[in-house]
């Protein structure tokens, strides 16, 4: 039941996030959306996503997963709905800023819930199911958005998808509770701060890995629909079908990434060895899969894009759960928030500013091929800074002292 709630929330989260990129070819002429302006809109979304993650992680650790996640879902659902009333690029940017701020708490909340409800050998499988929600949104979202836009207008896309979040909220508040063995959050746990988390190299290893690899997913999410239209000359229907194929393959990767590492742990591998070996495989195959941007055959390109996103999702399923392996539960939200913050900043740079600036001049090939190599660098950072993903000895007394001195 808990995994189902997290899965559907993540699906709604990504539906709200993906709308603008999918229907951009239909609305950009009316709003004068050139690639630089679109890149700027996505940049401010990701900066807000980065900033919101710091507050979101703190909110989750202080008030608990149930309240913190509920507040975040309310904010992002309201922001998604407001996009229906946008009448200029500035207004889209403003509403996307609020959307990014609210959506940033999603994966810190899911990771914290997984840490509260599942033992270490089951967490990656649980997160793989939750992470598959991103792909469900991307499988069915594009053709659904295009159908709604051509039937009732693009505004209906934002209004309908935003409303789904409000439908989810009552189920969340009525259902989610801490398991009995967890009990209520402790006073010490409530005083954990991101500043305390940042003292540990493991947090920086996680954050830098997110900084390097999150932008690749953002790039596919925000720029692939435009690429298929402008470079591959897909019709709206072909674009919807192509994206459905890409993210169907991606969903398999999200599930398999969790299943494989969980299987290895149950076979006697350490948590660190199982997670890192799975991620190393993904890092090695990623550059080959990105060759879709270079092949001539459009069908082969779509297949390779699907394999690339599958490799990313298998990687990310294991990376998402790493803070729950390394930090105690009362610090997981803050650790995840720190990582999501750096991931958002990386996204603003590598999938916002740079693509919007350089793609009109050099095209998509150098950008995608360059980013596909980030995974190897990220893996070495994880290996050096996070070690075997063993639980750190967290000095809660230092957190309490810091909180008292700042009062």
Predicted region positions:
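Helix-loop-helix hairpin linking two adjacent transmembrane segments in secondary transporters
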Residues: 130-174
């Amino acid at each position: 039941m808990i995994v189902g709630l997290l899965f559907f929330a993540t699906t709604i989260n990504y539906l709200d996030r993906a709308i603008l990129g999918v229907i951009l070819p239909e609305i950009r002429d009316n709003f004068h959306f050139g690639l630089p302006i679109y890149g700027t809109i996505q940049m401010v979304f990701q900066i807000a996503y980065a900033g919101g993650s710091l507050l979101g992680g703190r909110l989750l650790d202080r008030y608990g997963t149930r309240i913190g996640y509920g507040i975040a879902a309310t904010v992002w659902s309201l922001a998604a709905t407001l996009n229906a009333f946008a009448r200029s690029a500035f207004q889209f940017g403003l509403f996307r800023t609020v959307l990014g701020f609210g959506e940033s708490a999603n994966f810190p909340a899911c990771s914290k819930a997984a840490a509260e409800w599942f033992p270490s050998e089951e967490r990656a499988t649980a997160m793989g199911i939750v992470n598959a929600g991103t792909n469900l949104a991307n499988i069915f979202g594009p053709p659904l958005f295009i159908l709604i836009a051509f039937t009732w207008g693009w505004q209906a896309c934002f209004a309908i998808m935003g409303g789904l979040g409000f439908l989810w909220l009552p189920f969340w508040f009525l259902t989610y509770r801490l398991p009995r063995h967890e009990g209520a959050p402790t006073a010490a746990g409530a005083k954990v701060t991101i500043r305390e988390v940042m003292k540990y190299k493991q947090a920086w290893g996680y954050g830098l890995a997110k900084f390097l690899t999150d932008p690749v997913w953002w790039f596919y999410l925000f720029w692939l629909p435009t690429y298929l239209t402008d470079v591959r000359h897909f019709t709206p229907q072909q674009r919807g079908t192509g994206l459905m194929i890409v993210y169907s393959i991606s969903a398999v990767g999200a599930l398999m990434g969790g299943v494989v590492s969980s299987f290895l742990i149950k076979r006697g591998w350490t948590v660190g060895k199982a997670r890192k070996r799975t991620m190393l495989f993904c890092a090695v195959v990623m550059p080959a899969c990105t060759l879709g941007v270079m092949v001539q055959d459009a069908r082969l390109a779509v297949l390779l894009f699907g394999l690339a996103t599958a490799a990313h999702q298998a990687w990310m399923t294991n990376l998402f759960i790493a803070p729950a392996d390394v930090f105690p539960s009362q610090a997981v939200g803050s650790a995840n928030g720190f990582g999501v913050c750096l991931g958002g900043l990386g996204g603003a740079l590598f999938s916002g500013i740079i693509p919007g600036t350089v793609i009109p001049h050099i095209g998509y090939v150098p950008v995608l091929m360059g980013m596909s190599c980030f995974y190897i660098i990220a893996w070495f950072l994880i290996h050096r800074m996070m070690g075997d993903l063993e639980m750190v000895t967290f000095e809660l007394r230092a957190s309490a002292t810091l909180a008292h001195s700042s009062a």
